Amino acid sequence: MGKFLEVAAERPRGLNWEVMNLATHAGVLKGDATNLPLPYNDHEFFGVYSEHFIEHLFKYQGINFFKDVLRILKPGGVVRTVWPPEEFINILVSGDELTPDQQMFVEHYFNFYIVKEQFSPPGNSHRSKREQCALGLLHQKGQHHYLWGRTEMMDTLKDIGYTNVKLYPYQESGVPDFKNIDTPGKIRALHSAVVEATKPW
């Protein structure tokens, strides 16, 4: 049975999964993904997964993280990353007509994350719902530091040394253990990009 790692999750997914998080939870290794190297051996995992984590790092931290993931992956191992892409922000601020699903996202995100959680920076209540949602995704109370574009993410992974770098639809994967692993729900899927990349043999 292959061994997998999930970064920034609150609970293990199964016997072949390890989990690392800043917070302390049962069955979870307490660790800081910006304090490298990661506390794992070289060539230890068949796969490394993170969802809506990489945007919490500055770009240089994200690059260093992916470099160290390459170290802990076995040859042929795969990293899967899910994140809110820059392109979705561009859609929100473009002024173009939104699809019904995108409009549904705006209403949900605005009512819960902007009004209730106050993700958008102060002083922007005069802006449109779309603009406030974009600001909320960009900043999230100062917790989001960098939103990668899809092409930028793929090019960076290739430059680091990964191969077979591919975008996937939400919940789909080239790795059986990664299929249907992402958080369920249309809202999450609408503002998520998915990339997988392989460590060379």
Give the predicted meaning of each segment.
Residues G2-I89, V195-K199:
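Conserved SAM-binding loop
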Residues Q61-D68, K74, V78-W201:
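S-adenosyl-L-methionine-dependent methyltransferase catalytic module, highlighting the catalytic core
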